[in-house]
Amino acid sequence: MTPVVSIIMGSTSDLPVMEKAAKLLDEMEIPFEMHALSAHRTPAEVEAFAKGAKDRGIKVIIAAAGMAAHLCGVIASMTTVPVIGVPINSTLDGMDALLAIVQMPPGIPVATVGINGALNAGILAVQMLAVGDEQLQGKLADYKENLKKKIVKANEEFAQVSFKYKTN
């Protein structure tokens, strides 16, 4: 099985956040790979990964980074494969990572999700891959329909909650 998505993170400490993207890709039956790379500690490996991703069949890269968060932008600067950045909450409540990822110079875009937003990164990757793939579009439609059903169920449960001044 050849991976079409790469999930990249700075270290194993990012895995509890990034496994949300991995679980979604697994659920959608999309082959993916996971690597630990660091823009600061392993720059040569980051360069080799980024420059070789397209030739290896990678169609979307999900990159997570905290603090200075250069990983996403460095990867994006060396490939034409779309990069989705996931800012990791560490110092400054993740705002430093968010701003570092979202404020890319013209010509080097990184699609950025919210702080610790790995699930949305996974969904966005699936949406990118689903362009022109009706089967994958169907899986996405089912996924989103299930989200809707959860809200409908929540409202049914709220209807059973009783308070003296609750009007519905």
Task: Give residue ranges: language-model regions.
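Glycine-rich phosphate/pyrophosphate-binding loop and the adjoining helix
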Residues: 129-168
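Short glycine/serine/threonine-rich phosphate/pyrophosphate-binding segments
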Residues: 14-18, 42-46, 65-74, 93-95, ...
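Glycine/charged-rich beta-loop-alpha catalytic/anionic-binding loops adjacent to active sites
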Residues: 3, 30-31, 80-81, 102-110
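Glycine-rich phosphate/diphosphate-binding loop of Rossmann-like nucleotide-binding domains
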Residues: 2-41
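N-terminal beta-loop-helix "entrance" segment that forms/cooperates
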Residues: 34-56
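Glycine-rich phosphate-binding loop
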Residues: 49-87
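Short, glycine-/small-residue-rich phosphate/pyrophosphate-handling segment
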Residues: 92-138
